[in-house]
Amino acid sequence: MTHLTVYPDTDPATVLLDTRDGAEIAASLSGIGVVFERWDAPHALGEDADQTAVLAAYEADVKRLMDEGGYKSVDVVRVKPDNPNRAEMRQKFLAEHTHDDDEVRFFVEGAGAFYLRKDGRVYRVVCERNDLISVPAGTTHWFDTGAAPHFCAIRIFTSPEGWVGHFTGDDIATRFPKFESEPQ
């Protein structure tokens, strides 16, 4: 279930907000310029569904998002627990970074956790199927796939280069709860 936990960025043991209420999540994230919406991801993906199949299944949604936001490129990231590169992928995304581009993600399968650092706080957003999140360019953040990742997200960009991260070198991600610690 979609879950927002807010911490002071200096104290991961102190919880300032903990909610699974979609409206409260959207309102809290809106306060830091992040768009969060619940959409419908009605298409079940086959085990072998590749980027082409995923984009074909969600073509109308992707086109609408790209037209509305002036986005130029799209791709799909799909990671399963048996992915041989899962550990290195996790480490790459766990490093705090920013982008020159908005980070727009529509989750169509599984779940993962965004950690957004803004105004002295860390916003941990566990996104799952049906969640759309748009993180503004320049927002300091990291993403945790979990130790046994299972998610598929459509990624939409204004830049034709796609995902380009600018790493901060800060080890803040090592101090906050990892995604696999998410209570069910």
UniProtKB/Swiss-Prot annotation:
It catalyses: 1,2-dihydroxy-5-(methylsulfanyl)pent-1-en-3-one + O2 = 3-(methylsulfanyl)propanoate + CO + formate + 2 H(+); 1,2-dihydroxy-5-(methylsulfanyl)pent-1-en-3-one + O2 = 4-methylsulfanyl-2-oxobutanoate + formate + 2 H(+). Keywords: Amino-acid biosynthesis, Dioxygenase, Iron, Metal-binding, Methionine biosynthesis, Nickel, Oxidoreductase. Pathway: Amino-acid biosynthesis; L-methionine biosynthesis via salvage pathway; L-methionine from S-methyl-5-thio-alpha-D-ribose 1-phosphate: step 5/6. Fe(2+) binds at residues 97, 99, 103, 141. Ni(2+) binds at residues 97, 99, 103, 141. It holds the Pfam family ARD. Signal peptide: none annotated. The record marks 102 as: May play a role in transmitting local conformational changes. Its cofactor is Fe(2+); Ni(2+). Belongs to the acireductone dioxygenase (ARD) family. This is Acireductone dioxygenase. It comes from Parvibaculum lavamentivorans (strain DS-1 / DSM 13023 / NCIMB 13966).
